[in-house]
Design a protein with these regions (language model features):
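Soluble "head" domains of membrane/secretory-pathway proteins
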Residues: 1-26, 45-51, 56-226
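Hydrophobic membrane-insertion alpha-helices, especially the h-region
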Residues: 30-45
């Protein structure tokens, strides 16, 4: 009787152990939940990876480059609602910014800030004028681009926006649809342009980027294919 009771007691303990053991799926979920939560917090408030979709920012950024976007540079926003809960800074001329395309907010664009609220921007003869003053441009050297597989002779120039400098691609003989114009940047808006000036769909075509559409400031390139 004692042996039977002992065996029965052991069996009961094994049964209780099996019943008390969590399913494998629950164990995995419990293990991965903190990781998923951390990733969600990082992507929502701190940094988010972004893949360059086009050549409009050549030579600064190339199609296929992966960059990290600093999402708190211009304030902390609530996910989904996109409501700003903390103001940290404002975009400055020369910043490279990721934003939601005003005509289709489901699409992210990346361009350089040329005009901030109150600025008068004009573009003539491939030169930017800010409040009547031409942005400095200095010739760097020749450059050949192959946008359609056919060589397109171009040149590289250094453009100065205040203390910030960056390199542009200019196509001297290319008369694009965004050759000239004048704009006054409204409060709460920003004027954006690509560094590949004659091959960029930007504020010259569709207007200003509202402050609420800003995603963050472009940071380091963490992967490219060149």
């Amino acid at each position: 009787a004692t042996a039977t009771q002992s065996a029965g007691g052991s069996l009961d303990e094994e049964t209780r152990a099996r019943l008390g053991k969590e399913p494998v799926l629950v164990e995995y979920a419990r293990s991965f939940f903190p990781v998923i939560l951390i990733v969600f917090m990082l992507r929502s408030f701190l940094v988010e990876p972004f893949r360059i979709p086009s050549g409009s920012m050549i030579p600064t950024l190339w199609t296929g480059d992966f960059i990290l976007v600093n999402k708190f540079a211009y304030g902390i926003r609530l996910p989904i609602l996109n409501a700003k809960i903390m103001n940290i800074g404002e975009p400055k001329r020369g910043d490279v910014v990721v934003f939601r395309y005003p005509e289709d907010p489901s699409t992210d664009y990346i361009k350089r800030v040329i005009g901030v609220p109150g600025d008068r921007i004009s573009y003539h003869d491939k030169t930017v004028f800010i409040n009547g003053v031409a942005a400095g441009q200095q010739f760097v050297g020749p450059y050949t681009e192959f946008p359609t597989g056919i060589p397109l002779p171009s040149r590289l120039e250094v453009e100065s926006l205040g203390e910030k400098q960056h390199i542009l691609v200019i196509h001297p003989g290319f008369a694009g649809r965004l050759e000239q114009g004048e704009w006054t940047v409204p409060q709460g808006g920003y004027f954006m342009m690509g560094d590949n000036r004659d091959n960029s769909n930007d504020s010259r075509a569709w207007g200003f980027v509202p402050e609420k559409n800003l995603v963050g400031k472009a940071g380091m390139i963490w992967m490219n294919w060149n």
